[in-house]
């Protein structure tokens, strides 16, 4: 039973698909996808549940969400184990994701009250009241890299606002999506408030094209996000929130401070989660000269020693495999393409068993036209530069704008960087992959729109209703010109 529709677990009627553990290619989940007809059943179930859910008090909706948070905490180890088996991420990392699933709920609740909710004031004898109302049925598309944590950043704010949800997990991580829904069920969520539809491309197309949804909240690749953007053109009545990828630059200056701390910050930025975070550093700008040379030498040495292994290995690995063999092949093909354009590998990424790829670092300074692509894996491109102004200009030469970072102890360099860089997340002397759940998450350009995450998601899950109210009608002291009573 792979679909959860109107509170009932039912078998998919579409094509069979499986989830393979990327570190050994073993089947960890098997089921059938939802057909277009089943997707419509899920949308209708969400619509039928909408009125009852939105008319509950905020406190009542919040109580269900908090019950889900307790389920997540009580089952955190099972969540971590499932995510590790399905994504190949190290167990220490998936445990942090399970904890973040619960932590983000508290942020979402606070955000609802601070950014939406209700408020009123008196002005000129009138009560000015601001209320917020849910949009309706929200389609939520989840990614594979954080299959438990990231969908929560859409689903929980949507539910708190009074929306109902049809959730489609990534076809790479159906097991995690199924487990999350079972925890919602155990939390006492009313039937139809969330509906789960599993499947691949056809299931996703059917959900995105459904006339019954009022919005679509998406985290995933830029290519898919741009297709959705074109599909939703001319439909201003539907909310579309996109969080996509980035070709993220990290600039190191001669004032980088401690050598080992800088190397560690680069490794955490480029290779954590095997490079499968949308905020990972893809382009590394290093100054020409002795200090830059020393940094590269140390970075190469440290990268060669990174432990790459299956998630339950002892001692624990730093990173695991790519999500699939196809994803691994994509990284190797990208490396080969950069080499053909004139790039020189400082460490060559190599294929291992199943979907494993070792980290690669390639000097692309001599490539005249560097492809502006997101290589979603452990492939770091190095560019040598002469001046900070040149580095920032090169860093901004991208259609994306998700994250960027500067490593420098010089306050003047930081001020120049933050004044001229174009990105939504800009860090100094910290890894690019570091972000706060209280802060906006996202960036301009091809990286998306709005700011999907726990706190700012409240903004796109409800619309403001402004009212000017009085206890009764009243006549002004002077009637408008041309009016007689």
UniProtKB/Swiss-Prot annotation:
InterPro entries the record matches: Ald_DH/histidinol_DH, Ald_DH_C, Ald_DH_CS_CYS, Ald_DH_CS_GLU, Ald_DH_N, Aldehyde_DH_dom, SuccinylGlu_semiald_DH_AstD
Name of the molecule in the record: N-succinylglutamate 5-semialdehyde dehydrogenase
Role according to the record: Catalyzes the NAD-dependent reduction of succinylglutamate semialdehyde into succinylglutamate.
Catalytic activity: N-succinyl-L-glutamate 5-semialdehyde + NAD(+) + H2O = N-succinyl-L-glutamate + NADH + 2 H(+)
Top-level EC class as recorded in UniProt: oxidoreductase
Keyword annotations: Arginine metabolism, NAD, Oxidoreductase
Enzyme Commission designation: 1.2.1.71
The protein's annotated pathway: Amino-acid degradation; L-arginine degradation via AST pathway; L-glutamate and succinate from L-arginine: step 4/5
Residues bound to NAD(+): 220-225
S-S pairs: none
Catalytic residues identified in the record: 243, 278
PROSITE patterns: ALDEHYDE_DEHYDR_CYS (PS00070), ALDEHYDE_DEHYDR_GLU (PS00687)
Family in the record: Belongs to the aldehyde dehydrogenase family. AstD subfamily.
One GO BP annotation of this record: arginine catabolic process to glutamate
GO molecular function: succinylglutamate-semialdehyde dehydrogenase activity
Pfam families referenced in this protein's UniProt entry, alphabetically: Aldedh (PF00171)
Entry superkingdom: Bacteria
